[in-house]
Amino acid sequence: MSKFSFTIHSHYKKARSGVITTAHGEIRTPAFMPVGTRGAVKAMLTEAVVETGADILLGNTYHLMLQPSAERIAYLGGLHKFMNWDKPILTDSGGFQVMSLSKLCKITEEGVSFRSHINGNKYMLTPEYSTEIQYLLGSTITMALDECTPYPSTFEKAKTSMHLTTRWANRSRDAFVKREGYAQFGIIQGSVYKELREQSVKDLVKCDFEGYAIGGLAVGEGQELMFRVLDYVPDFLPQNKPRYLMGVGKPSDIIGAVSRGIDMFDCVIPTRSGRNGQAFTKYGTVNIRNSKYADDKEPLEHDCKCPACTNYTKAYLHHLVRIREILGPMLMTWHNLTYFQNLMSRIRTYIKLGKDFDFVH
């Protein structure tokens, strides 16, 4: 079994390209992770996700602990076997979903108490329990439990939240079962305050996580302010560890973040947009529901190798989406995930060649 490692092969200014080696294979970076919230990427076969070029996908601890339960998934052989995915899986800690989905959520020093949005059952998610759930799932990369600081937040509220995240990170690290090829990432918080972000990094680096995520962004602050934070946070982080920007996936955001030193991304944008009839292309976005595509004999993209582009016209995709045929969202999602993997591949190539890669429309 391979040890967990991160090797940087190329630099271009602050951007890096390399390979993360794990127990479940290699991840080419910069990497985009499709979101498989409940053990499936919506509207996609697992085999189809592989064909898009994805090296890793994301699972959701909160949803999987509720249905079908971490214990059941462990009994059935772990999340990899359960969903027939043999590449790396990163699972989030569940904290963000608890705080955003549960109407009766209470945050204390111990953890987060909440009621299931499914049946109202009461749960307590602690750093230790979140880490245990991810162990049962067999996650390649486990995330430490954090409190996602809302935006806007005052300096004092952000400071209190950041320190709670630090204490939870220490408990998560103590609970993590170290195994060859597996990793745990800590999550940097501090809202938009440089002093707090720097302190968060200093505190979490002491835990010696295998990688570090930047949380609390893409929560309403806007791209300009997000980039302002990313102008300095990566500089505080260890150069030899992967950097993961959580929940960010607009192509222009990815480009800007990679140029500031980020290595990993996840977002529901390509899948959600696909289900709603929006396609990403190198020429810009296409709303396939628009009536102007009803007689369009061209594919979404001529040089895209996904089934939607190699086999069908925009007119056919328009027809499927307008009549709400389930094949429509499937093909649109397949195309979007292929677009995002192609985007990451182009970025990696441009970094290797030492060229600017601001080519997103």
UniProtKB/Swiss-Prot annotation:
Its cofactor is Zn(2+). Keywords: Glycosyltransferase, Metal-binding, Queuosine biosynthesis, Transferase, tRNA processing, Zinc. Zn(2+) binds at C304, C306, C309, H335. One of its GO terms (molecular function) is metal ion binding. It catalyses: 7-aminomethyl-7-carbaguanine + guanosine(34) in tRNA = 7-aminomethyl-7-carbaguanosine(34) in tRNA + guanine. It comes from the Bacteria. SUPFAM superfamilies: tRNA-guanine transglycosylase (SSF51713). Its EC number is 2.4.2.29. Transmembrane segments: none annotated. GO terms for biological process: queuosine biosynthetic process; tRNA wobble guanine modification; tRNA-guanine transglycosylation. The active site is at D92, D266. Gene3D superfamilies: Queuine tRNA-ribosyltransferase-like. Substrate binds at D92, S93, G94, G95, F96, D146, Q189, G216. Homodimer. Within each dimer, one monomer is responsible for RNA recognition and catalysis, while the other monomer binds to the replacement base PreQ1. This is Queuine tRNA-ribosyltransferase. It comes from Rickettsia prowazekii (strain Madrid E). The lineage of its organism: Bacteria, Pseudomonadati, Pseudomonadota, Alphaproteobacteria, Rickettsiales.
